[in-house]
Amino acid sequence: MARKRNSYKSINDIQRMRGNRWYYHYYQYLCSLAYQLFEWERLPPSVDPSYLEKSIHQFGYVGFYKDPRIGYIACQGALSGTVDHYNLPDRFHASSVGYQNTFKLYNYSDMKEKNMGVAIYNNDLKCSTLPALEMFAQDLAELKEIIAVNQNAQKTPVLIAANDNNQLSLKNIYNQYEGNAPVIFVHESLDLDNLKVFKTDAPYVVDKLNAQKNAVWNEVMTYLGIKNANLEKKERMVTSEVDSNDEQIESSGNIYLKARQEACNKISELYGLNLKVKFRYDIVEQMRLNAQGIENVSRGTLGGETNG
């Protein structure tokens, strides 16, 4: 007869599962923010803007091509061919699901040929956004775990040493203590001299941990080019500090916007589409405010102030 599998989960297993959930929560949320940072205007109907942005953030670039058979297409793939004196590849090998092709890349206006395409880069380094978001999600999840541990430590600040003979009596005494009994009566046989009580006195540092988590959150918002100055007591910042923070955020956002605008210019020159791309401030700002509101409720604050 097969032995029954032990379904008991250790505290380490439970904590690991909880940490994984927090990691995926933050990772998916940050990815969702990144995927809708930019709004594309005048894209051909056959090009899905959601697929376009996901591919750019995931792989660092995507191909844009007008196929003679199916029309305009955004395609995943690999940069190929030879690299010129400006370190730009001259070909793109498309390898999307259901589409395989290799086409020359349009890099310079004075070197235009038929059946060329354009590579849309995520940034000047042509690298993905996701590794950084994974790192930030891990930091946020770890801090969330530590906060949960510190909160849980506040629930059992007293340890009472007991044995099989006096455990029930001590539980009854503690229940009276918890019930704010003015007088606690015990049996005369109870050995009070050997009664050992240990106070764990776990320090409450949730507020400090939340401040650190907000600092990490602000860092990732700056990384994505999203305003974040008012998440932590913006009224304490002088105008020069706010302006400096806004300049840093704008510079971070331009890392991604610049590469997309350059691709728009090339596509417009090559195909005459007059594409435009811009930062989607309204939706991103609403998502950020929603996240801020959820965090304020979770730590018992409104408008950044602690409720007394």
UniProtKB/Swiss-Prot annotation:
It is found in: Virion. One of its GO terms (molecular function) is RNA binding. InterPro entries: Gp10, Gp10_sf. Pfam families: Phage_connector. Keywords: Capsid protein, Late protein, RNA-binding, Viral capsid assembly, Viral genome ejection through host cell envelope, Viral genome packaging, Viral penetration into host cytoplasm, Viral release from host cell, Viral short tail ejection system, Virion, Virus entry into host cell. One of its GO terms (cellular component) is viral capsid. It comes from the Viruses. GO terms for biological process: symbiont genome ejection through host cell envelope, short tail mechanism. Coiled coil: none annotated. Homododecamer. Forms the portal vertex of the capsid. This portal plays critical roles in head assembly, genome packaging, neck/tail attachment, and genome ejection. The portal protein multimerizes as a single ring-shaped homododecamer arranged around a central channel. Binds to the packaging RNA (pRNA) and ATPase gp16 motor. This is Portal protein.
